[in-house]
Amino acid sequence: VLNPGRTVDAIEPGFHNDPRRSLYHWYFLRKWRRSLTLKSRLFPGLIDLDAVRQHPSIRSLTEYFVPRYTEFACADDYLSGYAVTGSRLAGLKIPATIIASADDPVIPARDLGQVARPSCLCLEKHSHGGHCGFIPDFRMESWINKRLETLFQPRDKSQGGPDE
């Protein structure tokens, strides 16, 4: 996620007419509620499940939880707290790569232009890839697996790195 607030907005009902985004909203909200139900069983009294059921969206549920369970006053402060847009990555000192897709229905591609670009940051923007790992067919094979293997290979000391 580059800008969590904009990602939440991208999948919220009413912000779009893209059925893929509605599917993601349904999936994430269902998964979050299931997790909260499990936590309430493990920690009785911690979570008010009746209140959880009253929130029909990820944004409204985030707005409910943030002031109650975090040090942030509101959802927007919380969401912007872990955004990597703006100058957040300007001080990056180690090699890093962001791999993104222009057609991702969840993470707006226009947010890539809002990311600081220190010399150690590589930004790979691809035309297609969606949100699920650049899967081109029903065999579930993707070039991204090989790309990640390459990225996570140990670096040669002559290439520089944090130990220098």
Regions found by a protein language model. Name each.
Residues 129-142:
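Catalytic histidine-centered segment of alpha/beta-hydrolase-like enzymes
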Residues 1-69:
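Alpha/beta-hydrolase-fold enzymes
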Residues 83, 101, 105-111:
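Conserved alpha/beta-hydrolase "acid-adjacent" motif
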Residues 147-158:
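C-terminal alpha-helix
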Residues 89-92, 114-118:
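Short, conserved loop/helix-junction motifs that constitute active-site signature segments
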Residues 92, 98-100:
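Short beta-strand/loop motif that positions the catalytic acidic residue
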